[in-house]
């Protein structure tokens, strides 16, 4: 029995583990032992005082335990619930226009270039490498309208070991850049091909997601057909909603027969318990209630909302309505690919709402940490698999070293009281970057540093 149990154990760590639960936004577990099976599952997380008991049960020796230094800690992998992979080509630039003008001047012309699979291969390889290196273990990607390029994105995410949803964008309306759209029939047919080929690949951690860009770029026929495809294959759906005021007015003008923006998606089979909608800055009480009833999720993208002067999402109000919510970078409307940036911006936006007396309190850093990990996993329907270090979940994790070479963080004697203090964790969340993320694990497999095969 001992030999059989031993074969199941692949990794054993001893040190500090920081994660969230639904009752505690940030739990710091000092001097704990965590074991990972060869299938990548967490099989135990207990105080180190239980080492002898665990060693007997799992048949390991003390020399097989990897001991973290007193300033290192593990945290769950970050979950980016909304990112446009092709827009990484111009991330960090061109955030000088409001949403609709920005789409027409920068985004659509850039995405049109992805009809070239060579362009797709270069940009998608770089964005997956960059996001993984910055701790994004799970990403919900928009591709472009090009099926073959979107399939390349899925292939690359699988090759690098990132957990992901990948969507082929659908749009049969685009009067301003007419060369970047499909016919309704093409969009439906190509989405079916994309889904079929993705499912045939049977990737272990990369799944297709139905992706109507937003109501302004999709006819009712297309939206309804996409809803049917999602239902037939039991797939997740992603899109945008209520990002800025001009967009909302345009939706009212295009679809006057609906009660509101949410109703457009709801009546066309696109608002389900497998839907994640980006932004939602201006959703009404009625709309939030519908989101809650349907079980749909929101991806909060604070960098993009600020950079394009779109709006300020009231996360506390969303949570009050019991709507699932995670964080997104929204590259490239959000100029940063880092989920640490999303954490910081989410705190700042909440502080602004407090300053303006919209709310009587603001989100804490700990609460936003939960949004970026466990909250994001719930928004994408993965909270039974990832999001924290509960036994039975996959080991998606980041090894954080605040004292890494050339670290942007300075630590002082007062930051340590025996073991790592919460001040060190806060310093990483506010000041840290990829230099502090020494190792990245997805499903128990170390994916950063990168292997020579990718």
UniProtKB/Swiss-Prot annotation:
This is Guanine deaminase. GO terms for biological process: allantoin metabolic process; amide catabolic process; deoxyguanosine catabolic process; dGMP catabolic process; GMP catabolic process; guanine catabolic process; guanine metabolic process; positive regulation of microtubule polymerization. Gene3D superfamilies: Metal-dependent hydrolases (3.20.20.140), Urease, subunit C, domain 1 (2.30.40.10). Substrate binds at residues 84-87, 213-214, 240-243, 330. Zn(2+) binds at residues 82, 84, 240, 330. Binds 1 zinc ion per subunit. NCBIfam families: guan_deamin. Its cofactor is Zn(2+). The modification Phosphoserine is found at residue 453. InterPro entries: Amidohydro-rel, Guanine_deaminase, Metal-dep_hydrolase_composite, Metal_Hydrolase, Metallo-dep_hydrolases. GO terms for cellular component: cytosol; postsynapse; postsynaptic cytosol; presynaptic cytosol. Catalyzes the hydrolytic deamination of guanine, producing xanthine and ammonia. Belongs to the metallo-dependent hydrolases superfamily. ATZ/TRZ family. It catalyses: guanine + H2O + H(+) = xanthine + NH4(+). Pathway: Purine metabolism; guanine degradation; xanthine from guanine: step 1/1. One of its GO terms (molecular function) is guanine deaminase activity. Homodimer. Pfam families: Amidohydro_1. Keywords: Hydrolase, Metal-binding, Phosphoprotein, Zinc. Its EC number is 3.5.4.3. SUPFAM superfamilies: Composite domain of metallo-dependent hydrolases, Metallo-dependent hydrolases.
